[in-house]
Amino acid sequence: MSVVMPVPDAGVLARREEIVDALRAIVPGEGVIATEREMRPYESDGLTAYRQLPMVVVLPATTAQVSGVLAYCHAHGVKVVPRGAGTSLSGGALPLGDGVLLGMAKFNRIREVDFENRVAVVEPGVTNLAVTRALEDRGFYYAPDPSSQIACTIGGNVAENSGGVHCLKYGMTTNNVLGLEMVLMTGEVIRLGGKHLDAGGYDLLGIVTGSEGLLGVVTEVTVRILQKAECARAMLIGFSTSEDAGGCVARIIGAGIIPGGMEMMDRPAIHAVEEFVHAGYPLDVEALLIVELDGPQAEVDHLIGRIEAITRDCGAVTCRTSSSEEERLLFWAGRKAAFPAVGRISPDYYCMDGTIPRAQLPLVLRRTRELSEKYGLRVANVFHAGDGNLHPLILYDSNKPGELDRAEAFGADILRLCVEVGGVLTGEHGVGVEKRDLMPAMFSEADLAQQQRLKCAFDDKGLLNPGKVFPVLHRCAELGRVHVHAGKVAFPDIPRF
């Protein structure tokens, strides 16, 4: 493991049997897993390069059980890591050897659908795609659609503020969540927002969405649902260079056109996807844009014409528009399968997640190719071009000594480049453990200290998902008093209070 996690608390480990018995009293039946063999599936999330067995796994089924588990752990100084489906690509659900892994998979019911108010109330273990499937017979859907939507859960989406291919027009999770029920580390249950469109007081709902499981455990989510557009068509636009494709993205948005989705892939990704899905992608191009327009038929036809004119000016070598709903879905099936497709051409890959201003796409793509040559590792680029959210897939072989370290260094340089050109370290995958030690590249010590003060207002003992997001010490009394550089403190052996 290349990342450093908090040192296990020997006192907690010595009380393991006592803790397990207490948790079994709160979550009876098969809700507590404590054997190594049965805990093995929980040792990592989607960032499988890092693995660690938890001390114990707890699978509650009710808000009362979640409250009981957290209250007990708070009183007895036991760390807790919440987990949805374990699809996080930043190590956000990486367990702790002296902590409880709190799995929310049993919270899998859609409690209510209110078509008149256009909201649905769901439990956090419901998968993203299941929400849309429950609505589609009535012509509605849930807009955020991460590539992992068949597996990722709404609770995990809230934790990471997930987006997807249609977030350019319809927003991230934070733009589509209206209310939450959440359990604090003390066991207290609070409600934020609701079916109404606004709430008085501080925007705590906005603070919790994207907080990566550091502030509380979500047990219910009220989401906004949308009616399907009258018409939707997708365009495949090929270019001879990635720079031309990146320039076209900026031109389309600059013309005042906001597509339903705008994705980009480079040559390695195009070939991997086409071999895997047979989506009809052109193989003689260096970069491919997928642009979707939705709305009234006349508006869609008009926008397609405008985009065709822009692509000609930008040097597109091919432009094709879907002629049926089946073909539109096939275009998107290729993009949705990009990650597993790339997984077929390399033993391992390391997926990055930075966001940049759209106008910087050509520069960043060129610099990424230079970094690829520097580190001697191939990279396949797949990303949400419309909002500048990059997902470079760094190809490596973990069986070769040193390749994971090179992939990590390559990825860190990409993220530093994103910040350098005015972007941010993450778009939708979260910070987790993966980007934790890069936070000082983007935030000052004062920035990070203020964020930790907010964390301490929700979790005064620092027991909820520790070791994630912040590259500094986790105790509230030390905030602002310890110099941190590159995630390390001076005199680390000095006892802390």
Feature annotation, model-predicted:
Residues 1-71, 87-118, 267-278, 324-351, ...:
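N-terminal flexible segment immediately upstream of the FAD-binding catalytic core
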